Amino acid sequence: MPVHSHRYTQDLNNPALVLVHGLGSAGSIWKSLVPQLLENFTVYAIDLPGHGDAPLNKDEEMDPRSLAQAIVDYMVSEVQVEKMHVAGNSLGGWISLEMAAVAPDNVLSVTALAPAGLWHELPPRKLPPSLDARILAKISQYFMKT
């Protein structure tokens, strides 16, 4: 699976931080944060397949777990980074969590910012459904005045 990264560093001895963007974005989304991270990390901003500089192969699996495995494989085989911290937002947050699940020996920590995909069911209701109708009726009064 084609994954691409942009490396930013002041010191290659700093621990690796892999940044995973959300759907429809690219690794460049992290550029404004990179300068603050360079003092402590070598930063790898990932381009997911079909985003940024990474091509899309239509026959590849694109689910979060497959993408997570592809990023770990890419970092270990092509970049020669065995241990990494990972952070991601939205879909990238979900992929980051999956990276820790598929490669716990490689992922040192995860920061998932507003990760997608966590609600497979709606949370339990705290208020009775009948209250919805009363609230909507009250709100609609302000729009129905003539």
PLM features: residue spans?
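Catalytic nucleophile serine of serine hydrolases
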Residues: 54, 90, 114
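Flexible "cap/lid" loop of the alpha/beta hydrolase fold
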Residues: 97-102, 107-142
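Conserved HGGG/HGGXW glycine-rich cap/lid loop of the alpha/beta-hydrolase fold
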Residues: 7-55
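Short, hydrophobic alpha-helix immediately C-terminal to the catalytic nucleophile
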Residues: 31, 72, 97-101
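N-terminal cap/lid segment of alpha/beta-hydrolase-fold proteins
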Residues: 1-2
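Structural signature of beta-strand start/N-cap positions in the alpha/beta core
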Residues: 16, 42, 82-85, 106-109
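Gly/Ala-rich beta-loop-alpha elbow adjacent to hydrolase catalytic centers
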Residues: 88, 92, 96
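Active-site loop/oxyanion-hole signature of alpha/beta-hydrolase fold enzymes
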Residues: 7, 32, 44-87
